[in-house]
Regions:
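N-terminal, positively charged nucleic-acid-binding surface of large information/translation enzymes
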Residues: 2-191
């Protein structure tokens, strides 16, 4: 039985240790190996609750992603072939408000001063503004997730899949009408 010795550190330079581990993972293709060595095993599929790419990542994202990564690594240690699917949340009021501010328009101007198609095109571009920063964070924190083929919530395939699933839930009687208090923004005209 062979013995392996862990590297000993005299001083605690966590940034240096992190760089060394990331380099070792890159050299050994560790993330890919964690998948290929489990071909044929039971699968566990993880869809990341996607971050919004139109905002910069913060410490709360690091904390949430750490928990997500722990779950996936735990399932990997249990012998599962873990598929980790990244995604981008591209819907929402912050995207629209940011584009309107950048263009100097209001909701009422959409369809008159700017076509709906042009507005949507600009929103799609702007929502992906910080993807490079997110991808750097993903790598630097050692978060293992497949960023090569993310699901994107503005993609028609994604939207049609949700419509299909909602229709299936409706057919099975699993949707119901209810009443809740909703936040309202007078400035954005939402509610």
């Amino acid at each position: 039985m062979g013995s392996s010795k862990f590297k000993e550190y005299k001083g605690l330079d966590l940034s240096q240790i992190n760089r060394e581990i990331l380099e070792q993972w890159d050299r050994n293709d560790a993330f890919h190996q964690s998948i290929t060595t489990r071909e044929g095993h039971p699968t566990f599929v993880f869809y990341e609750g996607p971050p919004s790419a139109n905002g910069t990542p913060g410490i709360h994202h690091v904390m949430a992603r750490t928990i997500k990564d722990i779950v996936c690594r735990y399932k990997t240690q249990q012998g599962f072939l873990v598929h980790r699917k990244a995604g981008w949340d591209t819907h929402g009021l912050p995207v629209e408000l940011g584009v309107e501010k950048k263009l100097g328009i209001t909701k009422e101007d959409i369809g008159t001063k700017i076509s709906i198609e042009e507005y949507n095109r600009i929103c799609r571009r702007e929502v992906m503004t910080y993807t490079d920063m997110w991808e750097r964070l993903t790598r630097d924190m050692g978060y293992w997730i497949n960023m090569d083929d993310p699901y994107i919530t503005y993609d028609n395939k994604y939207i049609e899949t949700l419509w299909f699933l909602l229709a299936e839930l409706y057919k099975k009687g699993l949707l119901y009408k209810g009443y809740t208090i909703q936040p309202y923004s007078p400035a954005a005209g939402t509610g």
